[in-house]
């Protein structure tokens, strides 16, 4: 299997292209500053992952920005801090401020020359439109949790994407699903029979940060630590 075997790269957005962990920690700072004990970055992210994953299972049709507001309130309760709904709703709106990784735009612009590009993201349409400005590339297809009515790792999200791609004349064998999260993406993508590329952004930190630990460690077909590394590997593949 070679990187040049594929017609389309389907990307997770948050955690892969957008640095959601930095965005979350920054946006939660007014809340965590009021917690009596000192929380590490990973303690904040792991608590967020627990509440977010549970809420996505309970209310799969709720828009992501609204779901984040509920997560904010759950975190405040867990940490014993009073928090208003105004604060919680502001946190839900913070998605627009989450930064892109420094290598994202350049790598996407390079890859766009050789592949069709698509997004499969646990987000609402309005929030993704704001993040998309930071990605600086035109995607051939965008599939959001809001449109699908469920959140990854639901198999429904991958079935939906594959059905839409089939309508674009793209076979499953021509798709390389590219993502950071083993839990949200690689486990269900592997179950769906997709080839996968792991952008292991957390290679230096270890742990799972803002994502849950997968039930099993899925096999991945390609592994890189950044989008820049993926683009470089593609250049090398072209040279043979």
Give, region by region, the residue ranges found by the protein language model:
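Asp-based, Mg2+/Mn2+-dependent phosphohydrolase catalytic module
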Residues: 1-9, 37, 83, 105, ...
């Amino acid at each position: 299997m070679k990187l040049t075997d594929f017609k389309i790269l389907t990307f997770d957005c948050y955690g892969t292209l957008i640095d959601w962990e930095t965005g979350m920690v920054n946006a939660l700072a007014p809340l965590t500053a009021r917690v009596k004990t000192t929380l590490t970055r990973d303690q904040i992210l792991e608590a967020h992952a627990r509440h977010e994953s549970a809420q996505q299972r309970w209310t799969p049709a709720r828009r992501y920005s609204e779901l984040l507001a509920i997560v904010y309130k759950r975190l405040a309760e867990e940490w014993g801090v009073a928090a208003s709904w105004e604060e919680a709703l502001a946190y839900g709106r913070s998605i627009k401020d989450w930064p892109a990784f420094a290598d994202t735009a350049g790598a996407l612009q390079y890859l766009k020359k050789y592949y069709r590009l698509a997004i499969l993201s646990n987000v609402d349409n309005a929030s993704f439109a704001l993040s998309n400005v930071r990605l600086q590339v035109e995607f051939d297809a965008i599939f959001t949790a809001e449109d699908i009515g469920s959140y990854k790792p639901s198999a429904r999200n991958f079935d939906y994407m594959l059905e839409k791609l089939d309508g674009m004349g793209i076979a499953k064998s021509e798709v390389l699903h590219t993502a950071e999260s083993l839990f949200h993406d690689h486990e269900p993508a592997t179950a769906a029979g997709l080839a996968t590329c792991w952008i292991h952004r957390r290679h230096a930190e270890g742990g799972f940060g803002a994502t849950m630990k997968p039930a099993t460690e899925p096999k991945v077909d390609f592994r890189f630590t950044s989008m820049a590394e993926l683009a470089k590997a593609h250049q090398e593949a072209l040279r043979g």
